[in-house]
């Protein structure tokens, strides 16, 4: 009412630009239009709440100086993403022309993305196809789920590469790129990714009967998911 004094504490302004940082990168291929980088586990792809530095974008700006601007100030050059704890291949656009070409391929599901995943348990079959819509979890907004009413179609194809009795190494191809898709689908399959603290993998370690295997799994400081192959058509050449 009239005469009241109102004090307002405003949150600190978010930075409007990303500062280049001299962070080592493993560049597997680079030309004038794009580059392919092997992102390490534990690195966030681009700045967001709680992660204003130390991201892949910070490192890329130091390495390249200039990237495609289509993704905006905080996501220059970023055409697709990997989860923080997932390692592996990412293609980055250095020019707007390359960005548009690559983004179109991802939108049309023309890019072939293959992962390796170490999962708990010994699958009963040598492979399979999972077709379950993935969307935001109905009660936990930080998780994804196949029980969401607003889920989007998602397809995951997997096959066993090696069996270790208490675990298995899978080769996983995704025909869609939904958030946490592989982790959610493999958990629904009954074989969560080793080291995945969100979708049941961390608690599953208590069921591993082999002490040596359990110790090795417990020593992992990340989820055992790696993007090891990425096939696309060069957007320029």
Predicted regions and their residues:
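RNA pseudouridine synthases
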Residues: 1-237
